[in-house]
């Protein structure tokens, strides 16, 4: 199930720092990447992952993420570097409505493996029937 996770923030008059450690995550961090310089009209993602879970946070800017479990879709608005969205494996993800200057940080519990991606929505619906 998707859930919001509050990240640890530290700060004083010099500025703020957000820390992400394995002990604070619902999984062990194996991969980290970020999406940036994305046009507002672009849709990123459009896939599901059989084995990878993810944590999404906008370290600057804002975007929306639609999560689909094969039966229902829910859209989340990310606009705080102090809050992250956890998305378990097996769900369809679409990231869109990127505000100019957005940097979307993504943490995963698996290294990249192209063979675990489901990029066809019809195939995803079949996957949900067999694994739901």
Language model features: what each stretch is:
Residues 92-96:
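Beta-rich strand-turn-strand
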Residues 87-90:
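Short beta-strand-centered segments at strand-helix junctions
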Residues 1-85, 100-103, 107, 112-122, ...:
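Non-catalytic, conserved peripheral segments adjacent to functional cores
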């Amino acid at each position: 199930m998707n859930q919001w996770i509050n990240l640890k923030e530290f700060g004083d008059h010099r500025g703020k720092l957000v820390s992400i450690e394995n002990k604070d995550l619902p999984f062990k961090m194996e991969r980290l990447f970020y999406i940036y310089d994305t046009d507002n009209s672009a849709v990123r993602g459009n896939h599901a992952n059989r084995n990878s879970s993810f944590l999404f946070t906008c370290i600057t800017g804002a975007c929306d993420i639609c999560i689909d479990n094969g039966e229902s879709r829910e859209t989340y608005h990310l606009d705080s570097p102090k809050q992250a969205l956890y998305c378990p494996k097996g769900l369809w993800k679409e990231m869109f409505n990127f505000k100019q200057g957005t940097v979307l940080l993504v943490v995963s519990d698996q290294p990249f493996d192209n063979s675990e991606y489901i990029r066809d929505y019809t195939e995803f619906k079949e996957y949900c029937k067999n694994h739901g």
